[in-house]
C-alpha cells in the first residue's frame, strides 16, 4: 500500500532493507503501479536457483513463492492485481482470507496465499497501537475513541496539517478539541446538540486508513519508536 504511505519515508525503508540484502519493490495494488516489477524482483531473487535448474536440465519450472504478512495489509488485493483477475476475496478488514491456496500468477510464478498472521503477544504496546491504527486488529477489540485520540496525538507531532487540511478546520491545542472540530464539520451530533465524538473518531480512523488524510507513515527505519 505505498499509495497510503509517506513517499519520503518509503524511500528510506527501501534503502534500509536493500542495505540488508533484501529485494524490495513498493507497489500500489489498486492502480497496479509497481506490480509488474515484482515479477522481475522474483526472477532476480531466484536467479541462482533458475540457473541451477537449467544445468540439471529442468526448464520452465515455475518459481513457487509464499505471500505472508499481518492481516489487512492488501495481500489478496496484490495477488488479484498481479494475476490480473479476481483470484482471491478481498475486504478492508482483517480475517477475509480464511485458508491457504496455490494461485498460478503466470507461467513463471505460483504463489501460495495465506491468511494474515499476528504475534501471540505484543512485547511493545506501540506495535499493537500501530496495528490497531491500520485495522490489522479487529476494531471490536479496542476503544475507537481512545484509539483516535492517540492517532491524533501522533498526527499533531509528525503530520500537524493532515487533519486540519483534510477537514478544512482550525488546528486545536488538544486532541479532544481537534476531534470536536471534526465532529462539528462532519455534523456528528447527538440529540440535544452534544458532539458525538465516538462517531467523529470512527470518521477520522476510517479516513486515515483510506488515505483521505494524506500519505502518512507510522514508523521510520531510523526511529523505530515514533509513537
Stretch-by-stretch model annotation:
Residues 65-84, 88, 114:
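Glycine-rich phosphate-binding P-loop
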Residues 58-60, 82, 103-104:
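Solvent-exposed alpha-helices and their adjacent loops that cap or buttress functional pockets
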Residues 3-69, 87, 187-189, 195:
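Canonical P-loop GTPase G-domain recognition
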Residues 23, 91-227:
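Helix-rich effector regions associated with P-loop NTPase G domains
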Residues 14-16, 84, 127-131:
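Glycine-rich, phosphate-binding/catalytic loops in enzymes
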Residues 49-53, 80, 86-92, 158-163:
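Short, structured loop/turn "capping" segments at alpha-beta junctions
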Residues 11-15, 19, 36, 40, ...:
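Solvent-exposed alpha-helical segments within well-ordered globular domains of core cellular machineries
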Residues 29, 79, 109-112:
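Conserved active-site beta-strand-loop modules that form the wall/rim of enzyme catalytic pockets
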Amino acid at each position: 500500500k505505498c499509495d497510503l504511505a509517506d513517499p519520503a519515508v518509503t524511500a528510506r525503508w527501501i534503502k534500509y532493507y536493500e542495505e540488508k540484502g533484501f529485494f524490495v519493490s513498493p507497489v500500489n495494488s489498486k492502480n497496479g503501479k509497481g506490480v509488474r516489477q515484482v515479477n522481475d524482483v522474483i526472477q532476480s531473487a531466484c536467479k541462482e536457483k533458475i540457473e541451477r535448474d537449467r544445468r540439471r536440465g529442468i526448464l520452465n519450472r515455475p518459481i513457487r513463492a509464499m505471500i505472508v504478512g499481518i492481516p489487512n495489509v492488501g495481500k489478496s488485493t496484490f495477488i488479484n492485481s498481479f494475476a490480473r483477475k479476481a483470484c482471491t476475496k478481498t475486504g478492508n478488514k482483517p480475517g477475509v482470507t480464511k485458508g491457504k491456496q496455490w494461485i498460478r500468477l503466470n507461467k513463471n510464478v505460483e504463489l501460495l496465499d495465506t491468511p494474515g498472521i499476528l504475534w501471540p503477544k505484543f512485547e511493545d504496546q506501540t506495535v499493537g497501537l500501530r496495528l490497531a491504527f491500520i485495522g490489522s486488529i479487529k476494531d471490536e477489540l479496542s476503544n475507537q475513541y481512545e484509539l483516535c485520540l492517540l492517532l491524533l496525538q501522533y498526527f499533531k507531532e509528525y503530520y500537524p496539517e493532515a487533519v486540519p487540511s483534510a477537514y478544512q478546520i482550525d488546528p486545536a491545542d488538544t486532541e479532544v478539541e481537534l476531534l470536536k472540530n471534526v465532529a462539528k464539520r462532519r455534523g456528528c451530533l447527538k440529540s440535544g446538540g452534544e458532539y458525538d465524538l465516538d462517531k467523529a473518531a470512527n470518521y477520522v480512523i476510517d479516513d486515515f486508513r483510506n488515505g483521505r488524510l494524506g500519505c502518512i507513515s507510522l514508523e521510520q527505519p531510523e526511529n523505530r519508536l515514533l509513537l
